[in-house]
């Protein structure tokens, strides 16, 4: 009667405090430059070493520029954070993939692609989108800086056991509908608090038919529904993705791992605290129109009106519409845009670049659009060039930048100017997220590509 979550959680329990939290063993800690400095400072103050340095992997991503990475970072705060991570990793004997290192990239892209993330693991990082790794059949969630220090010192963390939710999506996804659209659709129905307090398992035929990278996108956005994390049971798709990668088990170790991994699925009689179901046929290419990821709609639909909303909801909705410069009830099709961003830990993988390139091939970037195409890692960048995707993009008028979090958040040079519209494949569209006054519309790589070549919001199915 155990869920996938139960099986992994229970296998990692060290002890449970009566009427209190669980001491949970952690298999993998990822550290980036923004949330780790105080944790390492705390260890120094108390004279504590990192208990299991081989379990910790560090890399800068939030502050890294996406051009001229071989030169010093100009912003003093960003430079200090990146340099501090380098020093901390060296001082404490930790694996560190610095800027320009061939294994560097966004931490939630590098972990899975290097098979540092594996099924059955418990994984934490001082970053909310750590839930991405759950796509591999792991328990993965973001933690605070004090908890990062706790894991560095003890390889354990104190956590209250969350409730479980299963979201089942059955059926076949339609033309032009991607994992990003599935996630945005879920949020539009469940809101940004619909999964608060839960750890979500995604299931159903539509989920099983997603590629590994599609599942990573889906789990990445779990936190935007309020969930503690999201996960997908490992299957042949997972195993084929992992096999032969750099840190994957080899030989007899692979056989032993596979034997265990195949047990990582919810039992047929498993009981979840909540069950939610969706039909894949109801999902079309999505786009957001407001200032939280739950404010999304099918690209052919109109922005909702305030009819039926409570007073508080109306105030919030009107504030969002004012910020975005939209009117209730209007369509976004044909709306002129200024920027397109392909990248982030949500959609910065090779499949995302393949999708984008497939739609822009033989076309040209619209003159009114500034496009930032940012690989999620140097491995993705190398694969782009190996497959000739860079040539397709260059011929269409696009340029590929260097890996990093880039325009997902305004912590580096890639900021959207105030008042400008950005069709972005990232994960958050909060006010000012991409820069003070920036207006963000979240979408899939296909929707972003359609906007990039037409200069306006366009249904990608019209170009496919």
From Swiss-Prot:
Instruction: Report the catalytic activity.
Output: (2R,3S)-3-isopropylmalate = (2S)-2-isopropylmalate
Q: What EC numbers are recorded for this enzyme? A: 4.2.1.33
**Which key words tag this protein in UniProt?**
4Fe-4S, Amino-acid biosynthesis, Branched-chain amino acid biosynthesis, Iron, Iron-sulfur, Leucine biosynthesis, Lyase, Metal-binding
For this chain, one GO molecular function annotation is: 3-isopropylmalate dehydratase activity
Taxonomy, superkingdom: Bacteria
Is Metal-binding one of the keywords UniProt gives this record?
A: yes
Any Pfam family: Aconitase
* The keyword Lipoprotein appears for this protein: no
The pathway where this protein functions is: Amino-acid biosynthesis; L-leucine biosynthesis; L-leucine from 3-methyl-2-oxobutanoate: step 2/4
Which GO terms of type biological process are on file? L-leucine biosynthetic process
Q: What does the entry list as the binding residues for [4Fe-4S] cluster?
A: 345, 405, 408
Q: What class of enzyme is it?
A: lyase
PROSITE patterns, A to Z: ACONITASE_2
Cofactor binding note from Swiss-Prot or TrEMBL: Binds 1 [4Fe-4S] cluster per subunit.
Q: Which cofactor does it need?
A: [4Fe-4S] cluster
Main function: Catalyzes the isomerization between 2-isopropylmalate and 3-isopropylmalate, via the formation of 2-isopropylmaleate.
Q: Which family does it belong to?
A: Belongs to the aconitase/IPM isomerase family. LeuC type 1 subfamily.
Q: How does it assemble?
A: Heterodimer of LeuC and LeuD.
Which NCBIfam families does the UniProt entry name for this protein? leuC, PRK05478.1, PRK12466.1
Protein's name according to its UniProt entry? 3-isopropylmalate dehydratase large subunit
Higher taxonomy: Bacteria, Pseudomonadati, Bacteroidota, Bacteroidia, Bacteroidales
């Amino acid at each position: 009667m155990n869920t996938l979550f139960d099986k992994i959680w229970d296998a990692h329990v060290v002890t449970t405090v009566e009427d209190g939290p669980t001491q949970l063993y952690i298999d993998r800690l990822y550290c980036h430059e923004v949330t780790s400095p105080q944790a390492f400072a705390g260890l120094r103050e108390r004279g504590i070493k990192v208990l299991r340095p081989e379990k910790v992997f560090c890399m800068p991503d939030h502050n890294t520029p996406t051009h001229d990475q071989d030169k010093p970072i100009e912003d003093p705060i960003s430079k200090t954070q990146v340099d501090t991570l380098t020093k901390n990793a060296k001082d404490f004997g930790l694996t560190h993939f610095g800027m320009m290192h061939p294994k560097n990239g966004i931490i939630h892209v590098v972990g899975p692609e290097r098979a540092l993330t594996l099924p059955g693991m418990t994984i934490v990082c001082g970053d909310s989108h750590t839930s991405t790794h759950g796509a591999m059949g792991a328990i993965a969630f973001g933690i605070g800086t004090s908890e990062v220090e706790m894991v560095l010192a003890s390889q354990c963390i104190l956590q209250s056991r969350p409730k479980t939710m299963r979201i089942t999506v059955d059926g076949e996804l339609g033309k032009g509908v991607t994992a990003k659209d599935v996630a945005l659709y879920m949020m539009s129905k469940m809101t940004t608090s619909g999964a608060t307090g839960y750890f979500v398992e995604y299931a159903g035929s539509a989920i099983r038919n997603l590629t590994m990278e599609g599942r990573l996108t889906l789990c990445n956005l779990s936190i935007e529904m309020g969930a503690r994390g999201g996960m997908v049971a490992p299957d042949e798709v997972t195993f084929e993705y992992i096999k032969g990668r750099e840190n994957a088990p080899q030989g007899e170790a692979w056989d032993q791992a596979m034997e265990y991994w195949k047990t990582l699925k919810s039992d047929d009689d498993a009981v979840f605290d909540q069950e939610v179901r969706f039909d894949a046929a109801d999902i079309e290419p999505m786009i957001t129109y407001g200032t939280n990821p739950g404010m999304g709609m099918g690209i052919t639909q109109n922005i909702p009106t305030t009819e039926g909303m409570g007073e508080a909801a109306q105030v919030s909705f009107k504030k969002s519409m004012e910020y975005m410069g939209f009117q209730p009830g209007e369509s976004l099709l044909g709306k002129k845009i200024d920027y397109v961003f392909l990248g982030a830990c949500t959609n910065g993988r090779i499949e995302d670049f393949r999708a984008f390139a497939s739609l822009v091939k033989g076309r040209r970037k619209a003159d009114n659009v500034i496009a930032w195409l940012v690989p999620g890692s140097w491995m993705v960048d190398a694969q782009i060039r190996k497959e000739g995707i860079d040539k397709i993009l260059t011929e269409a008028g696009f340029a590929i930048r260097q890996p990093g979090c880039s325009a997902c958040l305004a912590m580096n040079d890639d900021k959207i100017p105030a008042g400008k519209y950005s069709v972005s494949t990232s994960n958050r569209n909060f006010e000012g997220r991409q820069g003070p006054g920036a207006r963000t519309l979240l979408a899939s790589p296909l929707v972003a590509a359609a906007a990039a070549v037409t200069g306006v919001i366009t249904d990608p199915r019209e170009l496919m």
